[in-house]
């Protein structure tokens, strides 16, 4: 993975070793071939290649996703000095960077510190003071996704949760003011309400060493706890996605 600097005098690239446990971010001066290592991500087991680069301050720094402290967080990296600043401290994973508003001095990102089965929009300041605040409405549990305008003043916001079809809105940021409802799925919601719903239970399974995995169970509409039923178990054990949300 490589990108040109804003002044086209440098190429900044990732160098991932064959074992995929060390990732270097290197800056190359195209005029003299001089190399400068800006960042080293290393893990005893595995390091993932980073797709989510965001240049800020006219190319003087870039935002980087890293699991260097055990959680995936956003770091700001200086091209001049290699200084690395943590922007999103805490015991949770940043799912992705949604956008950067340099006018307000903040980065928007998707995460869910309290419930990993859900997704919300947060923002953190670019100066590294550790302030993080939730932007998605507090009264809307579930999954939120955003497609932001380049200046991060507007976004297409999609919200859904189990049993509720997606609602798509145009919102104004940072106040998350709804400007227009684009898709309300009212007809689909009404039809779903006419159906006999299944009983759904969300729970966690302890797998040892203090680790708990999220799970969910769907029971038949006429479920009788005194009876025996066939059981279908679906397990996804890889790190690339979620099936409980």
Show the residue positions of the predicted features.
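Serine-hydrolase catalytic core recognition
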Residues: 14, 136-137, 144-245
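Thioester-forming pentapeptide GCGEQ
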Residues: 1-3, 7
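A detector of repeated loop/turn-to-beta-strand junctions in beta-rich toroidal repeat architectures
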Residues: 22-25, 71-73, 118-120, 165-167, ...
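Extended, hydrophobic alpha-helical segments in both membrane/secreted and soluble proteins
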Residues: 8-11, 21, 34, 49-55, ...
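Multi-bladed beta-propeller domains
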Residues: 1, 28-52, 77-101, 111-114, ...
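Beta-strand C-termini and the immediately following turn/loop, strongest in propeller blades
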Residues: 4, 12-19, 26-29, 55-69, ...
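WD40/WD-repeat beta-propeller blade-loop signature
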Residues: 7, 93, 142, 211-212
């Amino acid at each position: 993975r490589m990108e040109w600097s804003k002044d086209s005098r440098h190429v900044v690239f990732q160098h991932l070793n064959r074992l995929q446990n060390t990732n270097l971010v290197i800056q190359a001066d195209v005029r003299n071939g001089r190399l400068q290592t800006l960042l080293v991500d290393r893990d005893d087991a595995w390091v993932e290649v980073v797709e989510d680069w965001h240049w800020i301050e006219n190319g003087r720094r870039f935002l980087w996703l890293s699991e260097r402290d055990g959680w995936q967080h956003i770091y700001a990296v200086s091209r001049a000095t290699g200084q690395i600043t943590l922007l999103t401290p805490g015991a949770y994973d940043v799912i992705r960077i949604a956008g950067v508003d340099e006018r307000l001095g903040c980065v928007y990102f998707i995460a869910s510190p309290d419930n990993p089965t859900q997704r919300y929009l947060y923002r953190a300041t670019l100066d590294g003071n550790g302030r993080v605040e939730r932007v998605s409405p507090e009264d809307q549990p579930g999954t939120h996704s955003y497609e932001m305008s380049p200046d991060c003043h507007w976004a297409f916001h999609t919200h859904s949760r189990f049993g509720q079809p997606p609602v798509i809105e145009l919102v104004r940021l940072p106040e998350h003011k709804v400007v227009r409802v684009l898709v309300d799925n009212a007809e689909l919601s009404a039809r779903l309400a006419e159906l006999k719903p299944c009983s759904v239970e969300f729970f966690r399974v302890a797998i040892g060493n203090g680790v708990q995995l999220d799970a969910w169970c769907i029971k038949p509409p006429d479920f009788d706890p005194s009876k025996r039923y066939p059981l279908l178990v679906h397990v996804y054990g890889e790190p690339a996605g979620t099936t409980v949300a």
